[in-house]
Amino acid sequence: SGPGLIYGKGLTREESRLPGVGNKAISLKDCRNVTLKDLSMLHCGHFALLATGVDHLTILNLKVDTNRDGFDIDCCRNVRISQCTVNSPWDDAIVLKASYGLGRFQDTENVTISDCYVSGFDKGSVMDGTWQLDEPQAPDHGFRTGRIKFGTESSGGFRNIAITNCIFEHCRGLALE
């Protein structure tokens, strides 16, 4: 935790197969008691945060401005996401999954998303305060997303999920897939 910027300029927005080229700003797997607080993240590759199998994850007051996924919460338990701004014009801002990423089925459960702002403004424009809508549409699907979504790649379930007091702007809202 603590103020600072993670600048992922060298990350790719695609799945990386090149040596030394990454596609995630932060990746957590099979962790417990993790807190991410008071950080800014810019141009974060394919995932700003990929959390898989994390128990007791707190994400508080993060500002993310990227062109792909903001937070991917997969097979996690006891997660609190609060007071975050996630701008992700070409993909999902916050996505909850229950995939087979751990090599076993595991639900995503006990998740609270509150007091967050998700959007689909041009990448980088929320971080610099200009809030622009000049970029052409996303090259792979033709529309802005920036939403909160449940279900991508999921084979497990979801239990005890609460989304409260969140603002959705220039995005596709809440999606169930």
Predicted segments — roles?
Residues 1-177:
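Extracellular/periplasmic carbohydrate-active domains that bind, remodel
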